A protein has these predicted regions:
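Protruding loop/beta-arch "assembly-hinge" segments enriched in small, turn-prone residues
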Residues: 2-12, 157-178
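Structured catalytic/translocation cores of nucleotide/phosphate-coupled proteins
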Residues: 26, 105-107, 151-153
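Extracellular/virion structural assembly segments
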Residues: 13, 65-134, 164-172
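Solvent-exposed edge beta-strands and adjacent loop segments
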Residues: 10-88, 136-148
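Extended hydrophobic/Leu-rich segments
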Residues: 1, 8-9, 51, 109
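A generic alpha-helix preference that emphasizes hydrophobic side chains
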Residues: 6, 78, 153-154
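Short beta-strand and beta-hairpin "edge-sheet" elements
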Residues: 45-52, 116-164
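Intrinsically disordered, low-complexity regions enriched for glutamine and histidine
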Residues: 3-5, 24, 113-115
Length: 178
């Protein structure tokens, strides 16, 4: 597949070479689970790093012949968003504050996350990129903060149903591939 040179946010994305961190975009659905439509917010504004830990389930065995076998049978991905500075009017703040205020649990914490590969545009669809959507749970780890502002750090636990598709930046919409 031929990769074209693409300009995004007034910066040219190279057709080859190392990928800058900002080209891997992470979005979380800030809408309530009962909402009819997703409301994706991009993560990272106040973050110096955002790492999805894969947490592989690995079993290693040694047999009596001295051989080692390794089985990796699943992943339990999760990521930490710390700090998250609350901003009035931001849908993600409203969602997180609702979790704090109402001490929400179980299905009230369900959401979805989308990882968007900004280095991988969908040809013939301007502003559309290859993306992966996955179900997740939001875990607010604490709230409060210091003099820098009100903070609601949270963890995102990926729960499966990973689907490949396309993400349109202008409308923040995900469409699964057929």
């Amino acid at each position: 597949m031929h990769k074209m040179q693409l300009q995004l946010f007034a910066e040219l994305i190279p057709a080859a070479g190392k990928i800058k961190r900002k080209w891997m975009a992470h979005y979380i659905d800030a809408a309530l689970p009962s909402a009819n439509k997703a409301d994706y917010s991009r993560l990272g504004k106040d973050l110096e790093e955002y790492i999805v830990e894969m947490n592989a389930n690995v079993e290693t065995r040694n047999n009596i012949w001295g051989e080692t076998s390794v089985n990796l049978d699943s992943y339990q991905p999760q990521a930490s968003t710390d700090p998250y500075y609350a901003e009035i009017g931001e849908p993600l703040f409203d969602r997180l504050q609702g979790i704090v205020d109402e001490r929400q649990t179980l299905d009230d914490l369900k959401t979805s996350v989308v990882e968007v590969h900004l280095w991988d545009p969908v040809e013939a669809a301007d502003g559309t990129y290859v993306a992966y959507k996955e179900d997740a749970i939001i875990e607010v780890s604490s709230y409060g903060g210091d003099t820098t502002g009100y903070q609601i750090p949270f963890n995102v636990h990926h729960t499966g149903n990973r689907v490949k598709g396309k993400f349109v930046l202008a409308t923040k919409t995900f469409t699964a591939d057929a």
